[in-house]
């Protein structure tokens, strides 16, 4: 379903943009910014969540089969906490979106758009990471069809949102960003409701979400301020040097 969603997004975007008389080269270029820049960067922390969910399946399966549900919930809590400690600070990419894009994808024609959609959609990292871990939890307790069902439901609702956004607004690439954020949020929500249903798991909020989020906000602000300060200082130094020469 994850792979299907990518194909669906590309097909809808290209077809609807063509219907709205956008040149196919322009539409392809826009989608390339989404898939080749934004999505590549977003997937880095999500890949770490994937590895975490894969590694935790044996421990969760073992404790679940032994009917040690308390220990099983402990494994789930540790996995979610560890994943959030990685993924929540990763939204700091939004604060440093321009220098990141300037280093990795320095094409001047699309850098401003790539920076803007990264800043807009970086929060989806949290939703994708959490849904990935909850996928692993559900697979670990033998509910392998539940994540598939949740992803299918999320995909249908994703298409229901994306289609009118593309048809009736001029959001263009931002419609894709908003719709994929919605898709990730729905998967996250449905998977976590399923984990609660089958394990009786209730998520602790302060240590797992609130503290990393507060720390990440402070980190993002400081990184942005220091980057801008250093940039202005170095620009002044090099500008003066060039002027003297």
Protein language model annotation of sequence segments:
Residues 7, 11, 91-95, 103, ...:
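Membrane-embedded alpha-helical segments of multi-pass transporters/permeases
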Residues 27-49, 80-82:
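Alpha-helical transmembrane segments of polytopic membrane transporters and translocases
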Residues 46-66:
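Helix-loop junctions and terminal segments of transmembrane helices
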Residues 76-127, 160:
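Alpha-helical transmembrane segments of multi-pass membrane transport and lipid-handling proteins
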Residues 78, 125, 154-156, 181-184, ...:
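Residue-level recognition of pore/gate-forming positions within transmembrane alpha-helices
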Residues 123-153:
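Membrane-interface junctions at transmembrane-helix termini in multi-pass inner-membrane proteins
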Residues 131-142, 192-209:
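Alpha-helical transmembrane segments
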Residues 145, 155-189, 203, 207, ...:
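Membrane-interface helix-loop junctions in multi-pass transport and translocation proteins
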